[in-house]
């Protein structure tokens, strides 16, 4: 899905974390070449999910929950010129399965990981449920978010095989086959009600989440085989068509990216690009109009180092090119899990180490896997893990709010690369340690993001076509700044790129 356009100009660079950029004559200058004629994927959104804390944070006092919403969604500036938030353009709404409504054994020890459900045991609907999450839906809409995804971890507990929101094991769905149509009907009813009550139509429904895992306990979830996913999507596609809703079905939110192109832990739950988008497959879904022409996967456990990052995403891109070059890829969920060459997921980190690690993942997902969307896992977290953008006290009534450098690092992308932007060519010679990507927004603005994880500064020379003079605004995230604005930067001069920080350079059309 690569197209080529002529683009006015593009730039790249990086920066001094604590000072205005300045040239250092003692270091060799690295040339950065821009080819404005080459474009790649179109960006749809940068987002996050409301699981699980928004059900509580959405009931906090107005001042506190609006502060959280501003950090996530706002495109405005404060009176002093600082940015209120990171301007997320996508929001995933967790359609709950009802484990919070159960009095019996849920196998989910943490109440904050349980969810309410609109569907009740008697088959009626209670549209007062999930009120906190619905508040954040409205907050996102009011601040300009346009892409909304309703995603499901488990079918409603009243429909499942075992009466729980997680599985007894095995690779098959925790849903009797005779309830498949009821589950599909539930998703359509929820989508219709959210549209009627909130004025928000889900752009996408994601009916299964990480189907490769067995989901025995700890949180809501269900395994699904590829055959079961295909059967569900055919039923749901038919029901959406009858309803008149324009919502599309998004698949498959794979638990790891390699499950999209190889067998993973189970051949019946792997090879999902060819399974669903190769015309030779029995599970082909490309002929169902209600199925979005995209494949979604999660970057978990494939981010150990640059070698693994690149290899996995190259294989993913190659598989798409082989099966269906027009197929989009969305990276629809990520946080730091497991041990990544000693960089572990446990232990909250509000500083730059985690921010730079994740920025490197974002860069690779965008430039190697050609991701059209990039979405973080927990927008709001109460936990001692590297899983949140905004952290809060684990309280149902209110508490402290903590922003993170990770929040602002994602903002180096999300706040400035807007829906409809094209990624454009940006190449750097002799300095692969600098992670540089460039984009052109629909309004003509050029956006360049540069990640410098090194402990050393770098000098760069930006090579642009023609003899035009370029002045830009730079936004810096470092240990001491959070999208700090630096105006009137002359891009025709060599610049000193500082260590361990992220710059976004915006060149106004």
What role is predicted for each listed range?
Residues 44-50, 89-95, 99, 147-151, ...:
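Structural recognition of the beta-strand scaffold that forms the well-ordered cores
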Residues 328-412, 424-429:
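Aromatic/acidic polysaccharide-binding cleft in carbohydrate-active enzymes
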Residues 192, 222-361, 368:
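Noncatalytic carbohydrate-binding groove/subsite architecture in carbohydrate-active enzymes
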Residues 1-25:
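Bacterial Sec-dependent N-terminal signal peptides
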Residues 26-202, 217-230, 234, 238:
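N-terminal catalytic cores of secreted or lumenal carbohydrate-active enzymes
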Residues 486-509:
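C-terminal beta-strand-rich structural cap/linker in extracellular carbohydrate-active enzymes
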Residues 465-482:
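Solvent-exposed beta-hairpin/edge-strand motifs
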Residues 429-468, 500:
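Carbohydrate-binding surface patches
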């Amino acid at each position: 899905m690569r197209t080529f356009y002529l683009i006015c100009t593009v730039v790249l660079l990086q920066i001094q974390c604590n000072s205005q950029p300045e040239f250092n004559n003692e270091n060799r200058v690295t040339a950065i070449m821009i080819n404005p004629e080459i474009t790649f994927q179109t960006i749809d959104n940068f987002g996050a999910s409301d699981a699980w804390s928004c059900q509580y944070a959405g009931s906090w006092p107005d001042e506190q929950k609006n502060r959280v919403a501003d950090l996530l969604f706002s495109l405005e500036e404060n009176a002093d010129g600082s940015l209120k938030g990171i301007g997320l353009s996508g929001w995933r709404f967790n359609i709950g399965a009802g484990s919070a409504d159960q009095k019996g054994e849920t196998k989910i020890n943490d109440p904050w990981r349980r969810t309410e459900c609109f569907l009740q045991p008697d088959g009626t609907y209670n549209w007062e449920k999930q009120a906190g999450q619905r508040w954040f839906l409205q907050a996102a809409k009011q601040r300009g978010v346009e892409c909304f995804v309703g995603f499901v971890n488990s079918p409603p507990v009243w429909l499942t095989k075992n009466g729980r929101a997680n599985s007894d094991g095995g690779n098959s769905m925790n849903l009797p086959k005779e309830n498949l149509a009821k589950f599909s009907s539930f998703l359509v009813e929820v989508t219709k009600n959210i549209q009627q009550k909130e004025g928000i139509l889900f752009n996408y429904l994601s009916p299964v989440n990480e189907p490769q895992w067995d989901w025995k306990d700890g949180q809501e979830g269900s395994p699904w085989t590829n055959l079961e996913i295909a059967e569900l999507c055919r039923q749901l596609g038919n029901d959406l068509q009858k309803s008149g809703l324009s919502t599309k079905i998004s698949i498959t939110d794979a638990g790891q990216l390699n499950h999209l192109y190889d067998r993973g832990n189970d051949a019946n739950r792997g090879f999902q690009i060819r399974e669903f988008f190769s015309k030779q497959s029995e599970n082909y879904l490309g002929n169902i109009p209600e199925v979005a022409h995209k494949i979604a996967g999660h970057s978990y456990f494939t981010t150990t180092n640059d070698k693994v990052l690149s290899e996995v995403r190259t294989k993913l891109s190659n598989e798409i090119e082989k099966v269906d070059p027009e197929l989009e890829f969305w990276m629809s969920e990520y946080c730091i899990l497991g041990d990544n060459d000693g960089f572990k997921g446990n232990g909250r980190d509000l500083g730059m180490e985690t921010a730079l690690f994740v920025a490197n993942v974002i860069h690779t997902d965008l430039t190697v896997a050609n991701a059209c969307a990039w979405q973080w896992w927990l927008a709001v977290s109460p936990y001692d893990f590297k899983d949140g953008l905004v952290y809060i006290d684990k309280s149902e009534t209110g508490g402290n709010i903590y922003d993170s450098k990770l929040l602002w690092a994602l903002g180096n992308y999300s706040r400035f690369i807007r829906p409809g932007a094209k990624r454009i060519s940006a190449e750097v010679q002799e300095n692969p340690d600098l992670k540089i990507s460039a984009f052109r927004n629909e309004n003509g603005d050029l956006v360049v993001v540069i990640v410098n994880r090194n402990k050393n500064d770098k000098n760069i020379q930006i090579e642009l076509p023609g003899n035009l003079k370029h002045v830009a605004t730079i936004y810096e995230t470092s240990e001491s700044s959070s999208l700090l604005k630096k105006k009137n930067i002359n891009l025709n001069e060599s610049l000193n790129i500082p260590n361990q920080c992220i710059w976004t350079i915006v060149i106004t059309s």
